Amino acid sequence: MPSPRTRALTTPLPPLPAERSPVPPVFHATTWEVEDAAHLADLLSGARAGYSYSRVDSPTADAFAAAVRDLEGGAHAQPFASGMAAISSTMLALLSAGDEVVAPHSLYGNTASLLTGLLARLGVEVVWADLADPASVQAAITPRTRLVWAETMANPSMRMADLPGVASVCRVAGVPFAVDSTFTSPAMLRPLEHGVDLVVHSATKYLGGHSDATGGVVVGGEPAAELMTRIRATRIDLGGVLAPDEAYLLHRGLATLDLRVGRACATASELAAALAADERVEQVDHPSLPTHQACALARRLCDEGRYGAVLTVTPRGGRAAGLAMLDALRLIPQATSLGGVHTLASHPASTSHRQLDEDGLARAGIRPGGIRIPVGLEDADDLLADLQQALAVAVPA
């Protein structure tokens, strides 16, 4: 008989219960026992489905990705350690030296810096276009174009891409169309329904929804099977692995996604209407407003009444007034990120888009004094009162 020390390491695990748990289990294992050498070889080559090593695949992360896949109406999904891990793996999987990618100026700051920094050093060129105008995209596509990239709603301008129109252009050109749908989520808009090939999320935001877990996910339809295979291989090579505890928390957040997003969107629209009528406010960016670039697109593409849970408020008085308003907030905390249960506030020109110069900010639709307000689940009246008292400080009568 083996020694007690050895027995402590080799005691068989109990079998999984026959009863089904309504809560997904968490598997912390980094490695998995196999039947024989051929079994492991088949797992690593992809000839056989299963698990071998946690950097390759993990059942807890896969369960989360599969849930997002179903919400998006996709056929394939891959989990990642963060939204930027998902974005960078997608771009590096599809782009090589000499290739071009078509993208809008209104991009998340780190996506823009990835395109103009790392990918530029690798020999990839960005061709800028207006993704709300399919003709602009068509004019930007060349024989070297290997990817068209967009955001469903841009951070923080809330500009939208014409998903069906651009998808049609990409289909004719034979170019993959990928969108970052972080700001919308499948509780508001499902890009695959509009002809998009790949949908990317920072799951840290609305999918998780509680500001306590970091992750990302890429979803593709059946026609994108080969693209998803390349993205998975790049994830394995780069190591952007979603940890099991993070995957569990993100998966749990999906259960309340529809409730949270519906409430936050309704509150954001209410705040946008009230602030747009305030004489102390120069501009409010929110697709529910008739004056916003994305108003018609939002009504055509989004679920009814769900036109975004983020608004940007620019008080009269420029950058100084914006910062004064931000510092005067009492209920709403200053913090980065979005999509959680708490309403937050930040100054994009000095945070998420700090790497852009004045011209770059203007092209991205960001005003120097703009304050981004990702709306949470607080009562609208309480949020409005805080914003109005902060406006009174920033723009005195």
Predicted regions and their residues:
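Short amphipathic alpha-helical segments
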Residues: 49, 75, 214, 246, ...
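Conserved C-terminal alpha-helix-loop-beta "cap" of PLP-dependent enzymes
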Residues: 281-371, 375
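Glycine-rich beta-alpha junction loops
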Residues: 13-15, 28-34, 183, 205, ...
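Conserved N-terminal alpha-helix of the aminotransferase class I/II PLP-enzyme fold
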Residues: 31-88, 110-117
